[in-house]
């Protein structure tokens, strides 16, 4: 790699990169990937500024090399590549002369035309994620961010790309060439995998002041200081009688340890009430896709272009009407919102050039659906001190709901195979350490089992929707932006396919804190008639919008097409986790690995191959009311993945509480099965803690019912 860098880059750039690395105590001969990355970044910064000048009138102009007009002023000041002291001197001098706010981190360039600092990024990873990391690190709206990737993608603050297309194309071509050159020498894979996220340095802190006093105050009785208590805990020998130890620790505790027998545990009490309703951010088994195969239209890859192309594949549109109203909403507004989407998509088509994004007109129906001007006015606490009767407003207890059969059907469907592949082989990420080829082999076997799984489709759909929504929330805060819900896959024959599930319209999104909410309206296609399970669709208004001709064994049948519309909301932190749903693949792969490891240690050899290729063997998947469920290893992989995906899709405080508390009971039951004669105290309190989490969440209720099945079979 070092030789390649010295051949590929201008000697001045190589020298600057070496200097920069030495300044941070790094060796270009050892950290060769970092050396290449620094050179690439420097070259992009220089290319960004090359040939760009400002003329006497203050306009930006491009002048190629060799032009005699030496009186022109450079448009960009290059900060990257200078030593730190010099760089900060330049930044300070710019801030003093222009009045621009001083940045927290050293930027790469200053743009005299736009009067702003510019941060240039070059990434080998997914461009959206890198952009968000940069934005989170800089935390300044004044510094303009512009990211390039080696795949020819780019992303910039508010989609303002600063330079003309030709200059940017030059940079993209150069990056592509570097990638090709590296690949031809077998260096690309290691370079691509070596990129780490943006790092911020955390300070180590001692416990002092108030925190120290709080720590001392919260010690158990009979302890004078934190050190004293730590020493006691470190030296605590847990043998002997537990009751005695407990009474030693505190006079108030008197615990009677009760033996835990097969007859001790009772089933969890599930709540009574109306059946629970669907609460995921997008439709799962009921979703319908409008798809195009081998997309090659102009602007392919731009979501709005793709969406319009997908919409054109369907010819059965009809005058929409409401078939299942939302109990509490103003249903005609949902109908008008869909009509508005259709009308505005039609308007786009009539324009000469289709725009890359579409902001909806702020009509009364959209303002209502997105809760515009509905938030209560915020008042500064200082202005309220004099009111004696200040109190938090009363909120009702959530209404209890009973388990409904649809959530088990949703889960079963998520474990099934589809006829498309949703991930490429390297989606789970390459091995970083050369830990033999076993890890790669396991990953490839696992990927083969889950790449066609419906849960994997949900992952890619979730990643896409959350990424698009978070980007729009940051880039178009005040706009009601129309966001197509899109996914991409490959057919059995390996043909690329782009799918449209429907649309989202985003509300105002001035998201300062992680938990600030952005409202959105989702409109999703479906063939499911909502009248079959109206309780599932309590939060939706459902329209009938067309008729679809389906091929079946008995010929062509016409089925009504529905649109599921609802108001929903999410936050920055939820979108961040949604963008990272691919982690579910990793989590379930690790669970499978631990099963293989256990098997391998018994047999004293690696069992990976036998594990995946012995199709006759069945494995325990779980326990249902019917008994212990068994299936192939592929089914185990897909079930574990579906569980992980549903934990992400249905994440909630109820799930957190249920998982943490039920685990304690699970461990006690496991100990009983292993003949370890467990003892418990306050088992009633544990049941109470578990059951207070069983309120109305469909996924938690299903897990609780599975838990009851497990108890029944475990204690036979």
Swiss-Prot record:
Posttranslational mods: Phosphorylated on serines and threonines by host kinases, including human casein kinase II.
Compartment list: Host cytoplasm; Host nucleus
Example GO biological process: viral RNA genome replication
Major place of residence: host cell
Manner of cofactor binding, per the entry note: Binds 2 manganese ions per subunit.
GO cellular component: host cell cytoplasm; host cell nucleus
Domain of life: Viruses
Listed EC numbers: 3.1.-.-
Function: Plays an essential role in viral RNA transcription and replication by forming the heterotrimeric polymerase complex together with PB1 and PB2 subunits. The complex transcribes viral mRNAs by using a unique mechanism called cap-snatching. It consists in the hijacking and cleavage of host capped pre-mRNAs. These short capped RNAs are then used as primers for viral mRNAs. The PB2 subunit is responsible for the binding of the 5' cap of cellular pre-mRNAs which are subsequently cleaved after 10-13 nucleotides by the PA subunit that carries the endonuclease activity.
Assembly notes: Influenza RNA polymerase is composed of three subunits: PB1, PB2 and PA. Interacts (via C-terminus) with PB1 (via N-terminus).
Name recorded for this polypeptide: Polymerase acidic protein
Record organism: Influenza A virus (strain A/Chicken/Pennsylvania/1/1983 H5N2)
